[in-house]
């Protein structure tokens, strides 16, 4: 039979080392939840399986050719064979005719569906929004716990974290293309924070739409001599004799990593600030919770909810924001 939500979620929800750590919108809670949390996967809603949208490629004999989701080694997958909102729901303009948000959709033709229909993510299980590797290696007892989420904010192996629930997504223009930092290809940096992954588009890009993203900030090791992002050897012996989680020596772990990846390591390291963005497509809320419902412009405007500069504006365009 076809894979179930449990098959897919076991790996994808635990990416990053724990439940909902990485993505923010894919948690184990999706296995058995309500439409209040996710209208598509709620057992009292669509009760859909992941493969209903994330499809695969098969040959003429029906044999599996490809998982259907490209970009597997990277931070965020390509669309592959994935269905989009309009494949099931129809044209954005026509579906909102006669609804309380018709005017809003007519005024905002570059808003992707997810912007309004995912007002927040990590609405059930908290997600990491900050991660500081520089703090790793300390013997701290007792381990501090975030009072709001009940999750530890420190791990000797991984450093210090910030956990959040009900995170308002960061909005950026997106046309499906990314700038990604990749080892031995474009792994050097010239300014801080180091942008590990970000959509390439801006408001001038033809066909680009505004989409929601999870913004992840933190710090991680880099070569102080040649300003190159490094890959530390964390565990096991395949990557060398000095895993960080075994000896807690960054210098040795980074040398192991460089030997394995073929990077040049000068022997001097530092921790640099980093930022990356990940797509947000799950946790679609019931339509009554959508941003702008009943003409509620204040859901986005006249406050600090939106980073208008990231969208190419000098500020909120409603009062006085302008573009070049």
Predicted regions and their residues:
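C-type cytochrome heme-c attachment and multiheme electron-transfer modules
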Residues: 1-324
